Amino acid sequence: MARFFDEWQIGDRIEHALRRTVTETDNLLFTTLTHNTQPLHLDAEAARASEFGQILVNGTYTFSLMIGITVADTTAGSLVANLGYDKLTMPKPVFLGDTLRASSEVVELRPSKSRPGQGIVTWRHQMHNQRDELVCECLRSALLRSRSA
């Protein structure tokens, strides 16, 4: 279960238990729902002719999956608002069949100046594949309630 603002400390780290093996259906559904017509995500022939030689998983799916995996352990039940995502990088591609796992580390904490009983937590979220390659990373800031409020 997620924690409240006053229960976090800088340096707290979570290796999220939930993992996901990305399927063709995951990629196809997300790509079509978001109207992304990039052939590298949809066209096996075009993808085979690319430098990657196979279909690439949509990067925004990878990002969304990373955030989704972290919610139960970070913000579920204590979130007031997501404030933003910074320094999003995708240093390695994700392919169909990759198994992805996420981790989170608190890198900044500060009580809200305008909202008593609330505070801002910034996590570094990372996602790795089964080869332990970093495939996605970002900083996420969220406004959380304090348990003591």
List where the protein language model places each region.
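HotDog/MaoC-like acyl-thioester-processing domains
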Residues: 2-10, 90, 94-99, 103-149
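Hot-dog-fold acyl-thioester-processing enzymes
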Residues: 1-84, 147-149
